């Protein structure tokens, strides 16, 4: 029954994140899909779809937020397309993965707040919760870019902000990763695989064997 229903309507595993989050590189590492990875942030500038299994499609969304080397008009158009895709396809998104650069979280957040803006990373997680009715998988990427103490401080602040000061209720949904060292990637694969299987889908995400 699951296979028949899935084949009738595409369902999506959606990856979101700012242009410099390392989103597309993470997708490639997790899934083994042949995704083009650019040398500069913001390479993904359109909605890209990749079939995973019967009825299941991975969606790599463009980076949300400020883009380097493009006009403000183009940047706004891309950002509008991201939000429109998420809102119009919310009922068909079975899993959302929000990726962000944990190494610069506080620095970027404080800079935005001085200008009267909310953190794009926090805003996206809350937005996904609102339209999907469940907490997304959140990936705090690039933990190798700063000292452990800085990463811990950034992560603690992020958890407090997305949970209204109750970090323990969201901690299990947040995974720390480094593509450079591979740390945390196996655990993230396990989590995505388990969630998709629980919803009746076959996945290409390899489960890390326990020692």
Question: Can you annotate each of these PLM segments?
Answer:
Residues 1-15, 194-211:
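Basic Arg/Gly/Lys-rich low-complexity intrinsically disordered segments
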Residues 1-76:
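Conserved G1/Walker A P-loop phosphate-binding module
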Residues 20, 188, 211:
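P-loop NTP-binding site
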Residues 32-33, 43-44, 74-77, 114-116, ...:
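Glycine-rich, phosphate-binding/catalytic loops in enzymes
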Residues 43, 63-65, 101-105, 143-146, ...:
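Conserved nucleotide-binding/hydrolysis micro-motifs of P-loop NTPases
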Residues 81-170:
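Conserved C-terminal guanine-recognition region of P-loop GTPase G domains, centered on the G4
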Residues 134, 144-207:
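Canonical P-loop GTPase G-domain recognition
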